[in-house]
Every structure is written in C-alpha cells, then in structure tokens.
C-alpha cells in the first residue's frame, strides 16, 4: 500500500507532466494557428485543459483539503473530456496530405498523453482522499479515546478526597 508521501509525490510528478503537456499544446496550437492563417483554412485550435489540471494538481498536493481535492478531480474530468473531444475532432478533420498533418499528429499525441495523465491523476486523487479520510478518522478516534481517559481520571481524582477508594465496574466506592 502506498503512503501519503508516495501518493503526493506521484501527484506532483503527474501535475508537472500535465503543465508541460498544457504548455506544449498551447505552443502547437499557436503554430497551427499561424499556419492556418497563411493557408486560409480553419484553425484547429488546441484549447488545453491540461495546463489548468496540472496547476490544480500542484495545489491539491500542497493543500490536501477536501475542497481542493474536489476541484482537482473536477479539473481532471474536464481535462479528460476536453482531451477526448480534441482528439476526436482532430482525428475527424485531419488529412494525411495536409501541410498541417504533423501538427495535428502532435496535437493528437499530446491529447492522448494528457488523457492518460488525467485518468491516473483522478485515480491518485481518490487514493489520497481515501488515505486522508482514514487518517482523520484515526486521529478523531485517538482524540476521543484520550478525552475519555482524561475524563475518567478526573472523576477518580475528584472523588478520592484523600480517602482510599475502590473502583468496581467503573463506579467509585469509598472504603469507609
């Protein structure tokens, strides 16, 4: 079983990968846009949700709060959907004879890698949330057990008043 540190480390690596994919996708989209303007063909833009997903992943790994994990999961799902739609759109309009074919192929490759990264990031976020939930439950249980022990000790200290007493089945009984 993975520890929290291993999950967070993996999440950070994937988030940096997603940021890299996002920046690369934006660069490929910009080159594609400039070439499309010269050829008077419609631009097949690559709006990259992976950049936002990567930034939220780094925030999630640092904060580890429930709301940030939910935000990151939502970004991963949006990145997944955006990557699938982008891939399908590019696959449908790409022609091998087009001068933009290498850029479309690069965009489709980045989308596939981004889809895989978003899928693994979503899974890791669920693992991290599960780990944090178990940790919080354990802390609460320990705190409750400790406060119960302290309350029991306080009761016995208050009732002793210097006279010897016995405790039977949780009840304090004076010997005199």
From Swiss-Prot:
TM region(s), chain numbering: 11-31, 41-61, 67-87, 100-120
InterPro entries: TMEM196 (IPR037661)
Membrane topology category: Multi-pass membrane protein
GO biological process entries: negative regulation of canonical Wnt signaling pathway; negative regulation of cell growth; negative regulation of cell migration; negative regulation of cell population proliferation; positive regulation of apoptotic process
GO cellular component: cytoplasm; membrane
Main location: cytoplasm
Compartments in which it is found: Cytoplasm; Membrane
Keywords: Cytoplasm, Membrane, Transmembrane, Transmembrane helix, Tumor suppressor
Coiled coil residues, start to end: none
Function: Acts as a tumor suppressor in lung cancer. Inhibits tumor cell growth by inhibiting cell proliferation and migration and promoting cell apoptosis. Inhibits metastasis of lung cancer by suppressing beta-catenin expression in the Wnt/beta-catenin signaling pathway.
Name of the featured protein: Transmembrane protein 196
Organism this protein belongs to: Rattus norvegicus (Rat)
